[in-house]
Structure formats: C-alpha cells, structure tokens
Amino acid sequence: VRSMYTYIEQAPTVCRAILDTRDERVGGLVQLFCARPYRRLHIVASGSSYNIAMTMRDFLQAALGIEVTVGWPMSYILYDHLQPGDTFVLCLSQSGKSTNTIAAVEKAVERGNTVAVLTCNANAPIDAAGGNVFEYGSGTDDYYVGKGFPSSCTYLALFGIMAASMRGTLEDETRDALIDALSTEIGGMQDAFEKAQAFCAEHINELVRARRIMTVGIGGGYGLALEGALKLNEMTGIAANAYEMEEFVHGPTYEIRKDHVVMLVDLGGPGHERMMQLSQALHLLTDHVFVIAATEGYDEYSLELGTSSGRNVGSKSDLAAIRAIIPFQTAAEAICSKLDMLSYNLVNFDFEQEMKTKA
C-alpha cells in the first residue's frame, strides 16, 4: 500500500536537485518571462497546483515587483481571460492531464498572451495545448502531491528570485541571501517531518475524532491552509475547510463546537500578532486548537518548526512554506494509518467516472 510518508521523505532530495540545477531547470522559464517587460503575472491552476500558487504568490509579487494574481482554469476560460497584452500567463498542472487547465492554456493562446506551462510531465496531453512547457523536475511518481507540493514551491521561489535578478529588481546580495535561505529551508525538511510525526502521534486521538477541521492562514500561510484542508478532504473524508485569517472571525467561528479542530498556520510576517491573538481566543470555543508555526511564542499545542531563515532578507514573504506543508501531509497520512483505511474514497468512483477531470 502506498504511503504519503514515502514521498515526504523523498521531497528534500528532489527540492535540493531543483536548487542545484536551477540554471538548467528554471532558466528557460526565466528567459521567456524576461524577454518582455511584463507588468502582470496571472497564474492559472486547479487543486493542489492552485494551492501552490497561492502559497508562493506573495513571494513572487514581492520579488518581481509586479502584480501577481491567481485564478482557477474554468473561471479563466469563462470570465477572467480578458488580460492585458503585458500579462504573462502561467498555467500549472502537476499531472499535465487536467482537462480544465489544458482548456485554459488553449484559451490563453487564443487570446494572444504569452503562455507558459509548468508540469511534472512535459509529455502529457497539456503539451499539445500550445503553451511553452517546462518541467518542475519532481518526476511523475507521486502520491497526493507529497513531494510535488514542496518541489513546486521550490521551483516557483527560484523562478521569482532568478527572474527578479535578471529584471534588475533584486540586488545580487539579496538574491544570494534568498538562495541561501531556500537552501536552509530544504535542509530543514527532514527535521520538520520528524517533528510532525511526533506531534501527530501525540494528538492522533483528537485528530481522528474530529467531526470538523478548520484550517486558517494569511499570506502564504493561507495557501498552506488550503492545501491542508484539501489533503484532509481527499485522503480521510473528514469535513475540512480553509479560511483566510481575518475572514475566519467574520462568521465562520460561529460554527465552532467543542469537538471541532482548528489548525492555524503562522509563517511570521505582518499577520503574526493577530494570529497569536486568534489562537488564544479560540480556546474559548474549542480545546482542539493547533498551530503550525515557523515562529515562536505559542503554547504546548503548537508545532514550532523553528524560525525561518528566509525572512527579512529582501522579500516580504517567507520560504518556510516548504517545511510548513509537511505537518498537514503527515496528519492526513497519520489519520489514514490510525483508522486502517485506504486514502482513496471508493464511494466517489462512479462520480469521478461521470465528471471526468483528467485527459
């Protein structure tokens, strides 16, 4: 039986290889992007790829100094395709088989925008859609994007750093500091996995008994909250939803009951103080409040991954997302293991046959 743990353990090696071969692996996309003075980057993605884009959006925007937006493929096809000519459209698809993303690439080509595609398989059907196709470098063997998520974040971080350097919006000293910070984050992935395993073992009974799980983040942490909820949804079948930090307190908190679990993500940065305030207040509503933190100052229910080396070196975003996704992945697999259940929900088989999503 396949396990998410196998791919979590493989991820640091994959991320390190992408970093070490960045000129070869990422250079082509950087050259394409820097060929013209694009003033906007619009990322089109679905599922985990959307969550990856949301996780790295703030980092890319801060590094490149241009507006970066993220949208879903069908919304792009039907409504959001009226992009200015100076917009670079980047479509993400892990498998390269997502029918909605393939159609979005075709729409962007039809509109006349420059289109690039990032995928784990350049030989997949998306290659025929007409965009400039680049491979992340994580390979096609994966399980619920266990290694694909952090490796894709690594790739996008490198794209932002290298493109910003080529465009002249990032000084050499800052570029080198960010590369070093990214390397440090990759080096901390195994430690994050070990901490996550210990944390999940300690709190596994609370996790498996949860009637509802709510994940909360801000900035890049919101992208992680989205992916965390998705992993819990698709692997365990537990009802889980993600919320932006401030929107969470404008209604959704009224739903919370004592048997609900709330998982907060704090990567540091501007939302840190408010997130700490939220974590303390939530104990009035439920005893099951957990924090995945790349910072310090939380109670015993926090999983502190260690402060990020990527902060305050020229980017307003935090590269700790590469480590901070691991606890969510670990929790989903730990629940499956504890309940001795297959992660694939077989009752959805007929539905998926009717609503095809892969080419």
Where are these regions (language model features)?
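Glycine-rich phosphate-binding loops that contact phosphosugars or nucleotide phosphates
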Residues: 27, 34-175, 179-181, 218, ...
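Active-site phosphate/pyrophosphate-binding segments
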Residues: 2-39, 132-134, 140-147, 151, ...
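Peripheral docking tails and interdomain loops at the edges
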Residues: 304, 311-359
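Catalytic-loop motifs flanking and including active-site residues across diverse enzymes
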Residues: 52, 56, 151-156, 224, ...
